[in-house]
Amino acid sequence: MSFDSIFPLPRVRALGPRNLSAAAALRRVAAFPELIGVLAVAGFLNLWNLQVNGDANTFYAAAVKSMAVSWHDFLFNSMDKAGLMTVDKPPLADWIEALSVRIFGFNSYALLAPQAVMGIISAGLMYDLVRRRFGRVAGFAAGIVLCTTPTIVAMSRHNNPDELLVMLSVAATWCFLRALETHRTKWMVWTGVMIGLGFETKMGVALMLLPAFFLAWAWVHWDRSLGVRGNLAWFGQALWGGLALAVVGLAWPVLMWLTPAADRPWISGTTDNSIWSLIVGYNGLGRVSGQAGGPGGGAGGFGGRAGAGGGGAGFGHSTTGGALPGFSGGTNPFSGHGGRLGGGAGGGGNSTFGGNTGVFRLLNDALGSQAGWLLGGAVVAIIALIALTRLRRKDPNTGFLIAIAGTLVVVGVVFSFAS
């Protein structure tokens, strides 16, 4: 039973690529008035009076301005025009913003509109993701909830990379659902591509989708009667998805690894100028242990000084691990500033993210008003889906449930106990 059986809507043909003409595409979209409503609400909330946010996060804005005028800085995600140091994140979000600024000039709309559009796309994808399995009314509700969640609206009007990660995560889930429905390898590959692009946006955070996705894939496809050899086909499909993730997600890190240190900026957030330290340390375990500072906030300052918005842990830490590019003999050009590249690159106000760790952290004053208030509804929806699917194997609805609920658990645990 779907929500459409309770609140019926006119039956129309599903969206698809059969007729690629613009007029046909518009007619198909017009046949889904609820989708138009979702996109309209998202567009209004994300784009209205966007210029009021100015340059938003000035650290990323400065980096984008540098990247917009230099292809070298663009390629290596440099935070400054001199190509001295990279941003402390992968480049995908900055690349999109820099291309926009290169085309339209440096202004609030050119800087922030890409994220606003990503928020609109996310809402549309969420609508179709839920509609495919549970009907148009449910899809409309899902799209509206996503595009009106306060923290989603805020990030859609900001130049932090979070909104791109949201869009890619929803896109990965959409592709994964298509894989569950069709059992075709190409959709697993596309799932891997989307998660890989998410890795190029915020590194390890994007990988939190993987445990639940693999469990859902195995639950729907595992057939005990076939034995190990008989189950190799679906496992091989998962491996193809993993290969796509690795190729896409590691493309830029491998470029940084293979480029001589003298020919590229210093890798921010590291003591040894290693991209792998950035992945595993600053943007990996450091985010869990609290060694990397909190997310968000303003640009960090040099010499251990607090940056705009009270930057947390430093760009890096001590620079004794090697010479900065352009300075010979291990010279540290910032030795007069305490020998440190301080203030978190875009670091948050304090080193503790969202208050004290614990089971109820997502419901505290800092996080509850942003998205924590949705957790109760999410739990009710999961219980309803369990009753609806009865966890039947071979049922895409069951796979959808495991993927969504499992991701909620993984993300909830990580953000509840990360320091």
Write out the residue ranges for each language-model feature.
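Membrane-integral, polyisoprenol-dependent glycosyltransferases
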Residues: M1-A292, F302-S419
